[in-house]
Amino acid sequence: MEAILDVRNINKSFNGLKVLQNASFVVQPGTLAAFFGENGSGKTTLFHIISGFLKADGGDLYYKNTPISHPTPTSVARLGIGRVWQNPRICKNLSVLDNLLLASRNHPGERLLNYFVRPGQIIAAEKSKKSRAEDIAGETALDGKLGQAAGELSFGQQKLLSIGMLLMNEASLLLLDEPFAGVNAKMIDHISEVMASLKKQGKTIMMIEHNRAKASSISDTQFFLSKGEIMQKNDVYS
């Protein structure tokens, strides 16, 4: 099976301190991979590099067998890689629907497309996007919340909205930073159900998580980091 993400010998140092040392792993499509490790083990730095927010000192990234040269947040998003931060990056004064629509308008491909379409086509496209947003709200358990201000949602619902915004951009690889942090047990189960549903649709999920018991129970592969190195890998295929 062709890996959706192939990470080879990634290195990163800050002021002489090695944060990542020859980090190498592959993630298979349609799976959920969990990354564990103590604070400072390199997990977040690794996700920063994959999502284009930080430049590696060395090593290579391959997405669907294609090298990612000089990754930036924009170029990575165009490929179909999306990032959800521990503290959701949403517009709290806008409605859930407007956040979803805004996400699609901010997609690089969407901005380019608007230069080549006629006004009537834009109206039709907007109707199509609204329909898509309604579908995604259902997929992320936010149906019935479309008209509500995003800032009025619970913290867990805001995380689900962030996931929905990636889906509006047709992301196929989702990087989730601590999706279970700051939410209660019921919401953890809720978020887990959404992730399981996305997996069934063929989405691939990578997550950093300190709730090791829950993350291990729903993931296909677990990677353990220590001092910037991937020390162990467990998966259901072993």
Where are these regions (language model features)?
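Helix-to-loop junction immediately C-terminal to a conserved catalytic motif
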Residues: S51
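Catalytic Walker B motif of ABC-type/P-loop ATPase nucleotide-binding domains
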Residues: L174-E178
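Conserved ABC transporter NBD signature motif
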Residues: G59-P67, R78-L79
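The feature captures the beta-strand-to-loop junction immediately N-terminal to the Walker
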Residues: F36-E38
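Conserved ABC nucleotide-binding domain
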Residues: S69, K130, I136-G151
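H-loop/switch region of ABC-family ATPase nucleotide-binding domains
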Residues: E209-H210
